[in-house]
């Protein structure tokens, strides 16, 4: 089970976007990376194809999972733990003890 999943609201802990929050768009568990909406935006030069025109586009690049943390209810970053509730393994915020997904 992953600690950070698609749709989670996360905050950046390090890098040029430190402190910014965003929603996880994609998680790549084999590479330990995630794509976060509005964070780590880079410019890519795109070649013209039949469907798309050439130009410079802004695209979100992936960030390492160690540089993101889930945002708790009070808006501060929290670590994630696991607990068994009613025979199901659920994610729990270490800061508040609340179940993240349920």
UniProtKB/Swiss-Prot annotation:
The keyword rRNA-binding applies. GO terms for molecular function: rRNA binding; structural constituent of ribosome. Keywords: Ribonucleoprotein, Ribosomal protein, RNA-binding, rRNA-binding. Signal peptide: none annotated. SUPFAM superfamilies: Translation proteins SH3-like domain. The keyword RNA-binding applies. InterPro entries: KOW (IPR005824), Rib_uL2_dom2 (IPR014722), Ribosomal_uL24 (IPR003256), Ribosomal_uL24_KOW (IPR041988), Translation_prot_SH3-like_sf (IPR008991). Belongs to the universal ribosomal protein uL24 family. One of two assembly initiator proteins, it binds directly to the 5'-end of the 23S rRNA, where it nucleates assembly of the 50S subunit. Part of the 50S ribosomal subunit. This is Large ribosomal subunit protein uL24. It comes from Rhizobium leguminosarum bv. trifolii (strain WSM2304). The gene is rplX.
């Amino acid at each position: 089970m992953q600690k950070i999943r698609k749709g989670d609201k996360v905050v950046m802990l390090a890098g040029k976007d430190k402190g910014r929050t965003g929603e996880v768009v994609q998680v790549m568990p084999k590479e330990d990376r995630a794509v976060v909406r509005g964070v780590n935006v880079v410019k890519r030069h795109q070649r013209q194809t039949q469907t798309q025109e050439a130009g410079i586009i802004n695209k979100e690049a992936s960030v390492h999972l160690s540089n993101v943390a889930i945002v708790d209810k009070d808006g501060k970053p929290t670590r994630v733990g696991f607990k068994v509730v009613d025979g199901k393994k659920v994610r729990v915020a270490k800061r508040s003890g609340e179940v993240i997904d349920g």
